């Protein structure tokens, strides 16, 4: 393990700080639990760095209360009161979805997914945020 010095220094003309600030796309995939938890853990780190955060939840209904939403909304309030961290914007894109299909709901889910993805594209084009969480966006597609 290197002791504070990289074994190879990239010849890209960038400083270490510039390399650390580059945009990344991180995709968590796999079966079972942990993907959303990992994404929200990264969102906490982004908040601490002062990066404005946006969350798009494609599956969970606005009626459903979740711990991750409560925590990040509390951090958004803390930011508004103290200036610490960063603002957090939250979009719930669906009416709720489950593995049990109800007849007549497929079109609604598809329309919500299309509108949700259009919102993501608008926000990406505007470069409004420093950190984007697209939670469970592959399911509706």
Model regions and ranges:
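Walker B catalytic acidic pair
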Residues: 135-137
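Conserved ATPase-coupling elements of RecA-like P-loop NTPase cores
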Residues: 139-141
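Conserved P-loop
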Residues: 23-125
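Extreme N-terminal, non-catalytic leader segments
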Residues: 1-25
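Loop/turn-to-beta-strand initiation segments
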Residues: 128-131
């Amino acid at each position: 393990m290197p002791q504070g010095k990289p074994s190879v220094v990239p010849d890209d003309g960038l400083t270490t700080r510039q390399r650390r600030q580059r945009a990344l796309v991180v995709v968590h995939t796999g079966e079972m639990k942990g993907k959303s938890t990992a994404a929200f853990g990264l969102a906490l780190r982004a908040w601490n760095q002062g990066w404005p955060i946006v969350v798009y939840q494609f599956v969970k209904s606005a009626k459903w209360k979740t711990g991750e939403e409560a925590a990040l909304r509390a951090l958004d309030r803390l930011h508004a009161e103290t200036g610490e961290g960063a603002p957090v914007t939250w979009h719930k894109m669906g009416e709720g979805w489950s593995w049990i299909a109800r007849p007549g709901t497929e079109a609604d889910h598809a329309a919500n997914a299309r509108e949700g993805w259009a919102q993501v594209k608008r926000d990406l084009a505007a470069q409004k945020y420093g950190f984007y969480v697209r939670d469970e966006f592959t399911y509706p597609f």
